[in-house]
Swiss-Prot record:
Protein name: Energy-coupling factor transporter ATP-binding protein EcfA2
Quaternary context: Forms a stable energy-coupling factor (ECF) transporter complex composed of 2 membrane-embedded substrate-binding proteins (S component), 2 ATP-binding proteins (A component) and 2 transmembrane proteins (T component).
Gene that this sequence comes from: ecfA2
A GO molecular-function descriptor: ATP binding
EC category: translocase
Species in which this protein is naturally found: Mycoplasma capricolum subsp. capricolum (strain California kid / ATCC 27343 / NCTC 10154)
Keyword vocabulary terms for this entry: ATP-binding, Cell membrane, Membrane, Nucleotide-binding, Translocase, Transport
Subcellular location field: Cell membrane
Length: 289
């Protein structure tokens, strides 16, 4: 069974608090694909269905219609029990918005090794990997015996992320992974996600409200609105579509905000696929010659 191929959500739906006065349709018969080895960012306003959608990917919740297909494994609608749930959750690691609240062991070593050991990995082998995982998330290797509760919020988040990476799955699903971090923490995490994708060939699925991060890291952007996918494209295709951004009430990245202002002054760089300040400076210099 191969979980590394495309993840397909086929005509999926999900309703919270069904048959109560608080009933809310979070997903409404929508479909999409997360491609192998790609970085996909999911954007949309609060309540658009982003977080619900990513929880379908590893069976945390089950669709009410259609099916979830992970590689060559299908999870039909309304199924009561997923047969391959342990392997599915090993291969697709879901990192919640504040993963540091998931820490519970008395040492960092035990916390990071908990997932692999729980899924059947030899305990000694799992513990042996911990120093290298700490190094990967930019924490000192000698932290292994420390309590996670002695760490700062940002450090706890690094430990929690190391615990997900320890399971060595092919996919990381990240729900607002840099929320609440300082600028250096944000930069470190985005650098790590880029490295995990490029060097370790991990598929990254990231829900975020930070459009600057989307512009930097995404191969593809999925736009959610009122429980449906309303657009899919490259960062260039999405952020150069001002009508779309207005509809979903999302401001473009700062670089695109600057380019929109320049367009109003008669300098149009929006037809260029610009992703960095260096590319922007180069294209602007050509226009001003």
């Amino acid at each position: 069974m191969d979980f590394s191929k495309d993840i397909i959500l086929d005509n999926v739906s999900y309703t919270y608090a069904k048959k109560t006065p608080f009933e809310f349709k979070a997903l409404n018969n929508t479909s999409l694909k997360f491609k192998k080895n790609k970085v996909t960012c999911v954007i949309g306003t609060t309540g658009s269905g982003k977080s619900t959608m990513i929880q379908l990917t590893n069976g945390l919740i089950i669709t009410e219609t259609g099916q979830t297909i992970v590689g060559d494994y299908a999870i039909p609608a309304n199924i009561k029990k997923i047969k391959e749930v342990k392997r599915l959750r090993k291969e697709i690691g879901l990192v919640f918005q504040f993963p540091e609240y998931q820490l519970f062991q008395e040492t960092i070593e035990k916390d990071i090794a908990f997932g692999p050991v729980n899924l059947g990995e030899n305990k000694q082998e799992a513990y042996k990997k911990v120093p290298e995982l700490l190094k990967l998330v930019q924490l000192p290797e000698d932290y292994v015996k420390r309590s996670p509760f002695e760490l700062s919020g940002g450090q706890k988040r690094r430990v929690a992320l190391a615990g997900i990476i320890a399971m060595d799955g092919n996919t990381l699903v990240l729900d607002e992974p840099t929320g609440g971090l300082d600028p250096k923490g944000e930069e470190d995490f985005i650098n790590l996600f880029e490295r995990l994708n490029k060097e370790y060939k991990k598929r990254i699925i990231m829900v975020t409200h930070n459009m600057d991060q989307v512009l930097r890291i995404a191969d593809e952007v999925i736009v959610m609105h009122e429980g449906k996918v309303i657009d899919i494209g490259s960062p260039f295709e999405i952020f150069s579509n001002i009508e779309l951004l207005t509809k979903i009430e999302i401001d473009p990245p700062k670089l695109y905000q600057l380019m929109y202002k320049l367009k109003n002054k008669g300098i149009d760089l929006l037809n260029k696929n610009i992703r960095t300040i260096e590319e922007f400076a180069s294209e602007l210099a050509k226009v001003l010659k």
